[in-house]
Design a protein with these regions (language model features):
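Conserved G/P- and acidic residue-centered "switch" motifs that form tight phosphate/ATP-binding loops
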Residues: 75
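Phenylalanine-focused residue identity feature
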Residues: 28, 32, 42-43, 51, ...
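Canonical Radical SAM [4Fe-4S] cluster-binding loop centered on the CxxxCxxC motif
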Residues: 10-49
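Acidic-enriched, low-complexity/disordered segments with a strong bias for Aspartate over Glutamate
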Residues: 9, 17, 24, 39, ...
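Radical SAM/AdoMet-radical enzyme domain recognition
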Residues: 48-70, 78-173, 191
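Auxiliary Fe-S-binding modules of radical SAM enzymes
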Residues: 2-17, 177-181, 185-187, 191-192
């Protein structure tokens, strides 16, 4: 703890951002994210924090200097009634509430998320090519489906849409410039 009651990292810097994994479930099996093998043991439902517990925790930690909260997973859009959690958190005094997703369910959920109070969204998009994308995420997926979700997020007015590209040498490392060019002028930030 810092002198002003702030949470400090190992280098003595004030922590202002909080990432909360609201589920360990995911509809993808990304090589760069999920544990290998079929024997991965997910948390039991009763081991996952309830929306009320998450909100209580965030409310308690805001006075310690937290300004931004990012919801992650697994895939947070798989969490049932996620919009209710977004609404609960958006009513707390913080600067930013965002979510990181693989984008597969975004087209269907963007409007409700925005309406509930979500401000920003980050979509993991490792490739614009279906075959490379599918190989990296461990299931057959049309990239166009993810792009439609990003377009919907922009259409409903999410203020900041970011695309993260996990670069894997030999698979998608040559695509980063193409991905940046693809989103240029669309109001989407591309990062890695």
């Amino acid at each position: 703890m810092g002198a002003r009651g702030m949470i400090l990292d190992r280098l003595g810097r004030e922590l202002r951002d909080l990432r909360i994994s609201i589920t360990d479930r995911c509809n993808f099996r990304c090589a760069f994210c999920m544990p290998e093998g079929q024997d991965y043991e997910f948390f039991r439902r009763e081991e996952i924090l309830s929306f009320e517990e998450i909100t209580k925790f965030v409310k308690a930690i805001i006075p310690l200097g937290i300004k931004k909260v990012r919801l992650t997973g697994g895939e947070p859009l798989l969490r049932r009634d996620l919009e209710r959690l977004i609404k609960m958190l958006s009513e707390l005094p913080m600067e930013d509430l965002s979510l990181t997703t693989n984008g597969f369910l975004l087209k269907e959920k963007a409007k409700a998320l925005k309406h509930a109070g979500l401000k920003r969204i980050t979509v993991s998009l490792p490739s614009l090519r279906d075959e490379v994308f599918s190989k990296l995420v461990g299931r057959e997926v049309k990239v166009s489906h993810i792009l439609e979700g990003i377009e919907e997020a922009l259409r409903v007015g999410l203020k900041l849409v970011k695309v993260n590209v996990c670069v894997v040498r030999g698979l998608n490392h040559e695509e980063i410039v193409d991905i940046a060019k693809f989103f240029k002028g669309m109001g989407v930030i591309v990062g890695r």
